[in-house]
């Protein structure tokens, strides 16, 4: 059996694909796995690091909204679809599993031409263009938000890597805090804007950090690899403020933290819910509003806070986040609510859908 994964560009598309790859290999160590990608995406680093084959195709970014540029997409896609077809034929693919983004659409269209079954994992409350098109031809579609009004806990969740799905935050916390140079006992705020960072979050946190430190809060802050690290002078007797470019071990970062300030990408919401880490979610103010919808269910369940990007200020952090970090009982209740909302076996559920799709072809 050979499965081709289509989801590249950002960690939000790549990590769930790799979580599925790991789950497939646990079930059948002989399964062949190839990930489609482009030379401009994070997959060029993340996929080989995890030991999987990466096959590159030309990048054809898709407009988020209808624009004049949309008219040119079909012509530019032809060569990319042909390249994807050649990869499916070379690998004798039994299934294409897509996670959205501009890498996924050529994979879907190539699979349709060749009669290869398609499984789509839609992480966002509002699907993007690639998954909207691909779902017309898919044998199975895993939707995180279908039936949201009827069920507090939808059937499908976002596959998360095994190191996070099996994480015991309390047991790992001493090791995690030591690794990052944090105090073993102080309340800890983790800040990250995702794999690329977020300038707005960075600016606000750098401004509010002295007030948080004076209140006894320590901070672990991933600013993003493309952003400059702030110059920090650690004051004797004050809780540490630790800025880093990128966190390669998010499992340890989650274990070290009591709360997180972050964007509301589907992967982030899923990982935090899976490990029971409460968060203050700041949805990205562009796109089609999917990040706000991603976070709303866990926030309504009591596992997080929600603030618009324009409303995120140092004063908001002081007035809203600081009281939570200073209240162990409230942190416990929010952690419990997030953990009850989350799901740790989404990768195995998706493996089942892959096998169903392949069986339906035979």
UniProtKB/Swiss-Prot annotation:
The entry assigns this protein to a family as follows:
Belongs to the glycosyltransferase 28 family. MurG subfamily.
The cellular location(s) given in this protein's UniProt record come to: Cell membrane
- GO cellular-component term (any): plasma membrane
Q: What Pfam families does its record include?
A: Glyco_tran_28_C (PF04101), Glyco_transf_28 (PF03033)
**Enzyme Commission number, as recorded:** 2.4.1.227
Q: How does it sit in the membrane?
A: Peripheral membrane protein
Kindly state a single biological-process term from the GO annotations of this entry.
lipid glycosylation
UniProtKB keywords? Cell cycle, Cell division, Cell membrane, Cell shape, Cell wall biogenesis/degradation, Glycosyltransferase, Membrane, Peptidoglycan synthesis, Transferase
Q: What does this protein do?
A: Cell wall formation. Catalyzes the transfer of a GlcNAc subunit on undecaprenyl-pyrophosphoryl-MurNAc-pentapeptide (lipid intermediate I) to form undecaprenyl-pyrophosphoryl-MurNAc-(pentapeptide)GlcNAc (lipid intermediate II).
Q: What is this protein called?
A: UDP-N-acetylglucosamine--N-acetylmuramyl-(pentapeptide) pyrophosphoryl-undecaprenol N-acetylglucosamine transferase
Recorded catalytic activity of this chain's protein: di-trans,octa-cis-undecaprenyl diphospho-N-acetyl-alpha-D-muramoyl-L-alanyl-D-glutamyl-meso-2,6-diaminopimeloyl-D-alanyl-D-alanine + UDP-N-acetyl-alpha-D-glucosamine = di-trans,octa-cis-undecaprenyl diphospho-[N-acetyl-alpha-D-glucosaminyl-(1->4)]-N-acetyl-alpha-D-muramoyl-L-alanyl-D-glutamyl-meso-2,6-diaminopimeloyl-D-alanyl-D-alanine + UDP + H(+)
Q: What domain of life?
A: Bacteria
Can you provide one Gene Ontology molecular function annotated for this UniProt record? Answer: UDP-N-acetyl-D-glucosamine:N-acetylmuramoyl-L-alanyl-D-glutamyl-meso-2,6-diaminopimelyl-D-alanyl-D-alanine-diphosphoundecaprenol 4-beta-N-acetylglucosaminlytransferase activity
């Amino acid at each position: 059996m050979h499965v081709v994964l289509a989801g590249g560009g950002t960690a939000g598309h790549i990590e769930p694909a790799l979580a599925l790859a790991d789950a497939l290999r646990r079930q059948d160590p002989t399964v062949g796995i190839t990930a489609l990608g482009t030379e401009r995406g994070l997959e060029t680093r993340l996929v080989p690091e995890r030991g999987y084959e990466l096959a590159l195709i030309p990048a054809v970014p898709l407009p988020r909204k209808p624009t004049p540029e949309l008219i040119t997409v079909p012509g530019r896609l032809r060569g990319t679809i042909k390249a994807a077809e050649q990869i499916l034929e070379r690998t004798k693919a039994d299934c294409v599993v897509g996670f959205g983004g501009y890498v996924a659409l050529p994979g879907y269209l190539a699979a349709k031409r060749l009669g290869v079954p398609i499984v789509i994992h839609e992480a966002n409350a509002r699907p993007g263009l690639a998954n909207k098109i691909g779902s017309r031809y898919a044998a199975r579609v895993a939707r995180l938000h279908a039936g949201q009004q009827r069920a507090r806990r939808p059937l499908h969740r976002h596959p998360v890597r095994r190191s996070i799905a099996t994480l015991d935050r309390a047991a790992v916390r001493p090791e995690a805090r030591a690794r990052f140079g944090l105090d073993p006992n102080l309340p800890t705020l983790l800040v990250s804007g995702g794999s690329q960072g977020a300038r707005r979050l960075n600016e606000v946190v750098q401004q509010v950090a002295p007030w948080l430190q004076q209140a006894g809060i320590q901070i672990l802050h991933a600013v993003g690899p493309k952003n400059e690290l702030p110059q920090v002078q650690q004051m004797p007797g004050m809780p540490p403020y630790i800025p880093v470019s990128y966190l390669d071990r998010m499992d340890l970062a989650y274990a070290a933290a009591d709360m997180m300030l972050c964007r509301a990408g589907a992967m982030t919401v899923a990982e935090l819910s899976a490990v029971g880490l409460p968060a203050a979610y700041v949805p990205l103010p562009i796109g089609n509003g999917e990040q706000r919808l991603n976070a709303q269910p866990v926030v309504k369940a009591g596992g997080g806070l929600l603030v618009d990007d324009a409303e995120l200020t140092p004063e908001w952090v002081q007035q809203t986040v600081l009281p939570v970090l200073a209240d162990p009982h409230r942190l416990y209740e929010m952690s419990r609510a997030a953990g009850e909302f989350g799901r740790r076996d989404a990768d195995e559920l998706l493996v089942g859908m892959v096998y169903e799709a392949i069986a339906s072809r035979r």
